[in-house]
Design a protein with these regions (language model features):
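Short cysteine-rich clusters marking metal-coordination/redox-active sites
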Residues: 10-13, 30-33
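Cys/His-rich microdomains that often coordinate metals
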Residues: 14-17, 37, 80
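Short linker/helix segments within small regulatory modules
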Residues: 19-29
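A short beta-strand-turn-helix
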Residues: 46-64
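Short pre-active-site segment immediately N-terminal to redox-active cysteine/selenocysteine motifs
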Residues: 61-62, 68-72, 115
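Thiol-based oxidoreductase modules, predominantly thioredoxin-like and allied folds used
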Residues: 68, 83-106, 113
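Conserved redox-active cysteine motifs that mediate thiol-disulfide chemistry
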Residues: 68-82
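Non-catalytic, surface beta->alpha helical segment in thiol-disulfide oxidoreductase systems
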Residues: 115, 121-149
Length: 149
């Protein structure tokens, strides 16, 4: 896959489809079964769990910004809308993933997440950067730019 194409799995037949980023808004269809591909999910954060983390984050063809949060955490709630905005802005270039650490303790333990919010940027299955605290949108975008560079 090149930087100007995405690989999208068809939710109907499971076939993998190469879709140019420039054509995402044209309602692309699966090359095998001709059903519409699930592009709407590219514009919102993906909820990940202990059992989906490796597939959604570590094996992603796109870089991923993972937001580790908990429902009782005020600063986590404050950055939620920022994550939604970033998912829209970087659609097709960066995946935003949200991990509730209270419900998914294995990943929190694996990556030594001891305070929240904690975010980390993953590219090609490797953690590139770990960010702790409710960072302003501008600072997050600066870190994202380094990864997308």
């Amino acid at each position: 896959m090149t930087a100007d194409k995405l690989i999208l799995a068809c939710s109907n037949c499971g076939a993998k489809n190469r879709v140019p980023i420039s054509r995402i808004d044209e309602a692309p269809k699966c090359g095998k079964c001709k059903k519409f591909l699930p592009v709407e999910s590219l514009s919102r954060p993906v909820i990940v769990m202990d059992n989906t983390f490796d597939r959604e984050v570590m094996s992603s063809s796109l870089p991923v910004l993972v937001d580790c949060w908990a429902p009782w955490c005020g600063p986590c709630k404050a950055i939620g809308p920022i994550m939604d905005e970033l998912a829209i802005k970087y659609r097709g270039r960066l995946k935003i993933a949200k991990l509730n650490v209270d419900e998914n303790p294995m990943i929190g333990s694996r990556y030594s997440i001891s305070s929240i919010p904690t975010m980390f940027l993953v590219k090609n299955g490797r953690i590139i950067d770990k960010l702790i605290g409710a960072l302003p949108k501008e600072q997050l975008e600066s870190q994202i730019a380094r990864v997308l560079g």
